[in-house]
Amino acid sequence: MHLLVYLSLFFALALASVTEISLDNKHRHRHEQQGHHDSAKHGHQKDKQQQEQIKNDEGKLTKEEKILSEENSDFSVNLFNQLSTESKRSPRKNIFFSPISISAAFYMLALGAKSETHQQILKGLSFNKKKLSESQVHEAFKRLIEDSNNPMKAHQFTIGNALFVEQTVNILKGFEENVKHYYQAGVFPMNFKDPDNAKKQLNNYVKDKTHGVIQEMIRELDSNTEMVLVNYVLYKGEWANNFNPTLTQKSLFSVDKNTNVTVQMMNRLGLYRTYQDDDCKIIELPYKNDTAMLLVVPQLGKIQELVLTSKLINHWYESLATSIVDLYMPTFSISGKVVLKDTLRKMGISDIFTDKADLTGISEQIKLKVSMASHNAVLNVNEFGTEAVGATSAQASPTKLFPPFLIDSPFLVMIYSRTLGSQLFMGKVMDPTNAQ
């Protein structure tokens, strides 16, 4: 008997849909009449308000949440660096994942892990018992999940958990109570001896919880399955300050020194926080909430050499300064699939996937192990109505009036919540036209 963990297609599908909201006809007509620079001038007051909100959002975390944020940051960069190393075999492969959802799922599993299995999970997640107790970590995740799922919050970030257990298996009451208390995880009996019907029920559950975004989370189920762990993350962000779709045009993007692809390049003149040094240039794009996207553009050909650290990311954030920028960035849609079983083994979390696994904190009735763990995340950065707008075939030409910020080569993307103090998503965009 084994534990089947579907951290796939929905611990799995982290949908970060970044859409530009259309103006009503009256405002949109006036916006287009006034032109690019005039509209940017009128938008500066809104930009300034957004910059003030950024300052207000930061620094509201509790001591425990700040420590958890640091640990999640360490885990995030470790996982990113491991995935980046693995991707060198496919230099045009994009990377995208949700570190906080992976952390939540494995901390939840840690509630039922014991001995070396338990220690490996905590160490792999960068847990430091000298700074925080394990119970404090679970409490911090409890607050994070409650906050993220609060319908009164401006952000649209939702974490959900569910455990589907073979109806003949006795799950320890303490474990069931803990996952409900800390991770809002529902525990549901399931007849996995009828895998087709079980698959249908699981997919319907996820379809309902994700408002139809995910139609088919699970394609196959083994009749020997004893438990399925579902961890899903949904995120939808709207730019705090919109791009004008009529300014989008076709432009070239350099995948490497020898390869160019054609992309749809958006353009906006406005106030942004930016930073530049000899290695890269960075810009922060705020959403209509407490989150922001950070784009890091290394020199062409240098992205594969970049090794992230928490210290380096903190340096970037602390160095950001506000200025008027003429921004050119591509629309893109990428997905990233991570075979966690292979990647986490390389990061020290290995026993849980073998017969050495000790998950007797979940059930003492049978010997459990994690037989499958994968993670899919999808990011869409686009404009409303782009397909309906006739795009001209021309190279982007930044204005000379303000400093241009042109994103036309591979870049890193991070989506960060200031009030949650966490990296929600991380990725590397090598080719914006490669959706896989």
From Swiss-Prot:
Q: Which residues form a coiled coil?
A: none
Region forming the signal peptide: 1-16
Q: Where is this region: Disordered?
A: 26-60
Q: What induces it?
A: By estrogen.
Q: Which CDD domains match?
A: serpinA
- Top-rank taxon: Eukaryota
Spell out where the chain is glycosylated: N260, N289
The UniProt GO MF terms for this protein read: serine-type endopeptidase inhibitor activity
**InterPro entries xref list:** Serpin_CS, Serpin_dom, Serpin_fam, Serpin_sf, Serpin_sf_1, Serpin_sf_2
Can you quote a single GO CC term? extracellular space
Q: In which broad location class does this protein mainly occur, judging by the first location in its UniProt entry?
A: secreted
Task: Please tell me in which tissues this protein is expressed.
Answer: Liver.
Extract the Pfam families matched here: Serpin
List the biased-composition ranges (Basic and acidic residues): 32-60
- Key word Phosphoprotein present: no
Compartment(s) where it occurs, according to its Swiss-Prot or TrEMBL record? Secreted, Extracellular space
Q: What does this protein do?
A: Not yet known.
**What family classification does the UniProt entry report for this protein?**
Belongs to the serpin family.
Return the protein name.
Answer: Serine protease inhibitor A6
What organism does this protein naturally occur in? Xenopus laevis
